[in-house]
Every structure is written in structure tokens, then in C-alpha cells.
Amino acid sequence: MNYRIDNLQYCNWSREIFEINREAGLDAIHVTVVYHEDYDEFLNRVKEWDELFNKNNDLIFLGKSYEDITKAQKENKTAVFFGFQNCSPIEDDINLVEKVHQFGCRFMQLTYNNQSLLATGCYEKNDSGVTNFGREVIKEMNRVGIVIDMSHSAEQSTLDAIDLSEKPIAITHANPSFWHEAKRNKSNTVLKKLAESGGILGLSLYAHHLKDSTNCKLDSFCEMVARTVDIMGSKKVGKGSYLCQNKPDS
């Protein structure tokens, strides 16, 4: 069975956007519910999403497993999977990994651009890799069922996460650095190791990740997709649009 999945969206959520996703035939979307929020603030985001689910239950529902993607396709709805762009909601307490999973989190980045308690972000000058605490958190994420996302992480930290995780990881929204040398984009070394480990890459439409930014040409993007598939294989490459509808340009 084939599914249409967007591996990352970050929008100012409304019924209009959910309708657009349905018109696009998306069976599932991974949404950012946390950037830098702590645990209590994450719970507030959950309450906000509960209201969205209740008001738009003909279009969306909370996704928690692969089976929910099949369910969404059959019911002509979109399954919404919660993800964190940072590890801030678990604070410095490994027990919160299971707690956030219970409230629907299914993806968590180990860091967002900068150094965290778990790993090094892509904007740091020195990449010390996954920390000791990060190693323990990876084990716990594997245990409870949260996908490790290294989209905003530095090279060595990303390679460490691939090696340390007993389950495939994801880079949900980034592009290859061979196409555009943004700090957020990933090297061929990472792409190959990600694919070999069973992980997946979601290609991004975000301007800062694109060659020529907002002037990026469709042909150029498609050529990049084809070359990435040559490196990783067609089953390891998806889309992580980083759609930011109704958000300010800044």
C-alpha cells in the first residue's frame, strides 16, 4: 500500500490548512509541537491540539502508530504525528521520555542547532557528538517508541546517533550538502550511513535549505532528488516540506 506523508510541517494551524492537506491527499503529517518549550509548556500545546482535533475530527486525528496511517487513508483523513524540534520538554529527567510518549510524541530531535544536554547542533563550532546523557536518552526513546530525529544536528552527533540507536533514525527535513552547502544540510557520508541503517531522509522545501533560496528552480530540485535517490535508494527518501503556512516570513 502506498501512502502520502509529509515528514515535517510547522504551520499556524487552522481548518483551512487541514483542508489543504486533505486536498493534497496526505495520509499523515509530522507536526512540530515544540521548539524550545519545557514539559509543562508541552502539555499546554497538547491541550491546544486536543481542541483542534475536536473541532476538525472530520479531517484529522492524533496518529500514534503505523496502523493509524492506514486508518487515515481508509477514512479519508490525515493522521497527525507529534514531534519535537528540541529535547527541551524532557528537561534533564530521562523519566519524561516515557511521559511525552504517553501524550503523543513520536519524534524528537536531540538538539535544535545549538548544543543541548544530548548532542551538538549544526551551528556549533565544535561537535563533541552525542553526550553520555544522550546515549541513555536514545536507549529510552528506542524502548518507548520515539523516533530519533537529527535534522538540526551536527555531523558527528548525527553519525553517533545512527550508530547508537537500535532502531532506524530519521532526518525529517533537510537536503544534501552536495546540492547546497547550508549548515543544516547533510553530507554524503551521513546520507549513505542513514540509508544503510534503514533510516529515512525527508527533503525540505524551506528556502534556507534550497540552492538559490527562493529562486530555486524546479528542475534543479528534481535533479537533486534523483541524485539523492541514487545515493540512498528510493525507499529511503521522502518529503519533509517544512511547510510554514500562515507564519510570518521572519
Where are these regions (language model features)?
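Divalent metal-binding pocket/active-site signature
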Residues: P89-E91, Q102-N185
